[in-house]
Each structure stands twice: as C-alpha cells, then as structure tokens.
Amino acid sequence: MESRTPSIIDLNAELAKLTMFRRTPQSTRADTKGSVARLASYRDGLLLAIKASGTDHWERHLTGDELVHILDGTATLEIVCDDGPPKSFALRAGMIAVIPQGAWHRALSAEGKTEMTATPFPGDHIERDVDDPRSIDGKPAGAMAVMPSIIDLNAELAKLTMFRGRTPQSTMADRKGSAGRLASYRDGALTATKFAGKGHWESHLAGDELIHILDGTATLEIVCDDGPPKSFVLRAGMIAVNPQGAWHRFHSSEGVTLMTATPSPSEVIEFDVDDPRTAKHERA
C-alpha cells in the first residue's frame, strides 16, 4: 500500500526560528523570508506559521475555508461578508477565525501577531492598500452573506473537564462535558477535547485530519503502510496531520487537551485491537 506517514511538527520550535516582519500589501515572498514557515502540506494547501505586523494584502481562497489561529499578539480581521462594506473583527492570542471560502479578507496588526494558518490554494490577492477589494476586483460579492466563525479557544477550553478512563467503547454521552464543537470547517468540524485513556480507531474518508496538542501528552498510533501501526509521541505545542483514509487512534495516560479539524464522514472501530485492519468497522 502507499505510505501514509503523518506530518509531525514541533510548532514551538518552528516559531522560534521566525522573526517579525512589518508587511505592506506590496510585500513580496522574498520580503517576508524568515517571517513565514511552511509547516506541512494539508489537504489542498499548506499549514503556515507567520510572524507579521502592518497591513497585509486582500486575499480570498477559492477551494475552501481558511483556518487562522492567533498564537500571540493581536490583529484585526477585515472581511467582506455581504454586499455592504467590509466588517472588522478584533482577534487576540488564543482566538481562532474560520474564513469562508471565497470571502475577501486581510489582516492588520499594529504591534505584531504570531499565527498558524491552514490555507487552501489556489487564491486571488490584491497588492494595493484599498478599503474595499471589490473596488479593484470589479466583481460583486454576490449572495455570500456569510460571516466568519470567531472562536475564543481559551474560553471554550475553560468550559471542558478532563474525561478520565476513556476507552474505545466510550459513547458521546460518556464524553459529555469533555469535548466541544467549536465551529463548522470545510466538510467537517473544529472540536476541542480533554481526555485520558484510549480513543477508538478511526479513519477519515474525505480528507486529512489536523491535530494540535494544546496541553499534556499523547501517543498517536497510525497505520502508515503494510506493516504494523507506528507510534508517535506528541506533546504540547506539536501538530500532526493524519493522511486521508489512514487508520489512527490516540492514547494518553496522564491526560491531553487537543484541537482537531476533522473531516466527515469517518469510519470507526469500537474495539480495543492492536491493528484496525483485523476488525469490522462502522460509518460514523
């Protein structure tokens, strides 16, 4: 079978390599060198880490929503939501924005921001500092009328309790209060979870899954090839991209807090087996 090794990224280490760059709409890729890191391929785009201040160009993404996670600093998101003027949203460290597919948007930051983005390609951009990108693009927004999802991740995590003793047979009712749906994202959802124990084997049929370890540690077990499942130890500040269709599960002895961008539909195995290929699976 084709190798499906996950991408494992130490986000904190990658951020430490970057320097803050003051952007303008005319800034080129060469200008921003050293302030942007390509972390991994993800679905039809890239995971990026960015340190920037100033005013970015207007852009829009044609194939899917963009995920923006502010890790440090503050920013203002300007976005075209409908036929009216662009709207502004203040973002601070610990907040997430899901920017709808096709929506013109840009970020401004006076003092600087550090962020991680999941950015789909291709896209359009405008390298001029204008109040409304439609004055340059010449195309109406149409019947978009879609607002971005703005999530205060720290506030959402504070609502959750650690679920200890999780097993592959644990139900949604068992897990109530330990997991929360943050927002819709592409063909699935953003979720946050706190648990200790062992999750079920699962496989996502529509695309890669993005995992961000926010606190604690966990072991990712994943079927990468024809051999036995491989194990990867993840700690706070690390990211994993689980390839589309790859069977995987997590276990954590002391507890882990994680955020996921999970596509649907999925298949799951609610038995504690060493290899999911030996068991019957169900559609979730």
Where would I find each of the regions flagged by the language model?
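Short acidic-glycine-tyrosine-enriched beta hairpin
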Residues: 82-101, 224-244
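Short hydrophobic/aromatic-rich beta-strand segments that constitute the beta-sheet cores
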Residues: 49, 77-79, 117, 192, ...
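Conserved short histidine dyad/triad with adjacent acidic residue
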Residues: 46-62, 189-205
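Ligand-binding loop in jelly-roll beta-barrel domains
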Residues: 92, 101-129, 235, 244-271
